[in-house]
C-alpha cells in the first residue's frame, strides 16, 4: 500500500515538474525524455492513448478503406486497358483510313453495271454510278495495302465497250462473282 502511494506521489511530482517544464518550453512542445516514464501512470495512460487510439482507428479505417478504393480502380484500369485496346484497334484502322486519304480522281467513265462489285452493294440500285463511287473511294495506294491482291483497275474503270444490253443485266448474284478481281468477298473494297 505504501509503495503504491509513493508511486502515485512520485507521479504527481513528475507531473508538476513536467507541467512547469512544459510551460517553460512552450515553444518546443515535444515531450522530454523525463516525460516518457510518466506515461505508465494510471491517469495519463487513459488520456494519451484515447486521442492516439482514435486517430489510429481512423487511420486504420482509412487504410482499410483505401484498399477497398484501390480494389475498385483496379478493375476500372483493366476496363480502361480493354478500352485502350479497342482504341488501339481504331488507331490501327486509322492509318489505313489515312492511307485511304489521298484519292484518285479519274476522268469521267461511263457506268457499265457488268463490273458492279456485287449485287448486295449495287451502286446502281442506290442510284449512284459505281465508277463515280470508286473515283471517290479508291485510294492511290490501295494497290499497296497489305492483305489485298493487286487488283486490276480496269475492272473498276472499264470503258463501256460492251453493248448497251449489258446495262439491262442485273449485277452478279453473289459476292463471289465480284468484279474486283481479288478473288474473295473479304478482300473486296466494298466487302471488307
UniProtKB/Swiss-Prot annotation:
<dbReference type="Pfam" id="PF15662">
    <property type="entry name" value="SPATA3"/>
</dbReference>
<dbReference type="GO" id="GO:0036126">
    <property type="term" value="C:sperm flagellum"/>
</dbReference>
<protein>
    <recommendedName>
        <fullName>Spermatogenesis-associated protein 3</fullName>
    </recommendedName>
</protein>
<keyword id="KW-0969">Cilium</keyword>
<feature type="compositionally biased region" description="Low complexity">
    <location>
        <begin position="19"/>
        <end position="59"/>
    </location>
</feature>
<feature type="region of interest" description="Disordered">
    <location>
        <begin position="161"/>
        <end position="184"/>
    </location>
</feature>
<keyword id="KW-0282">Flagellum</keyword>
<keyword id="KW-0966">Cell projection</keyword>
<dbReference type="InterPro" id="IPR026717">
    <property type="entry name" value="SPATA3"/>
</dbReference>
<feature type="region of interest" description="Disordered">
    <location>
        <begin position="1"/>
        <end position="65"/>
    </location>
</feature>
<feature type="compositionally biased region" description="Basic residues">
    <location>
        <begin position="1"/>
        <end position="15"/>
    </location>
</feature>
